[in-house]
């Protein structure tokens, strides 16, 4: 892991994302993917955050860490064309980042099947995935 780049992202993230829980989630996604706990990661910058993001700088820092990123704008509803979030998908290769994007599209559209591969891709422990599959997605 390139410590300089992750330190810079860690110092920068709270200047963009004001919600502390979201900062922690973003950093956990990035670090988890970097150290191999997760194969892929996904998170987003909301409208009030994305205007503060230098996406070229962010991409460069992720690349310095050995991560590839795919960005995508997703509308948040309503008639305002500026009401969108900037999603990002991470992986050790561009193909993995694109796979993450595809998996999340399937999940959001309801076109996916519960299976171990999605859980593994997202970095969940086998026991958690098995429990989820056993309960058929009901987490009560």
Where are these regions (language model features)?
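N-terminal alpha-helical segment
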Residues: 111-114
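A conserved ligand/cofactor-binding region detector
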Residues: 1-107, 117, 122-136, 140
């Amino acid at each position: 892991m390139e410590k300089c780049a992750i330190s810079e992202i860690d110092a920068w993230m709270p200047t963009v994302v004001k919600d502390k829980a979201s900062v922690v989630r973003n950093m956990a996604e990035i670090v988890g993917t970097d150290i191999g706990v997760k194969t892929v990661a996904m998170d987003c910058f909301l409208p009030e955050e994305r205007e503060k993001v230098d996406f070229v700088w962010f991409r460069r820092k992720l690349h310095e860490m050995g991560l590839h990123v795919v960005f995508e704008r997703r509308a948040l509803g309503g008639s305002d064309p500026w009401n969108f979030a900037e999603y990002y998908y991470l992986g050790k290769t561009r193909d993995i980042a694109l796979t993450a994007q595809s998996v999340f599209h399937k999940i959001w559209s309801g076109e996916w099947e519960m299976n171990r591969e999605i859980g593994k891709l997202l970095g969940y422990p086998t026991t958690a995935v098995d429990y989820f599959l056993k309960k058929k997605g009901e987490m009560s």
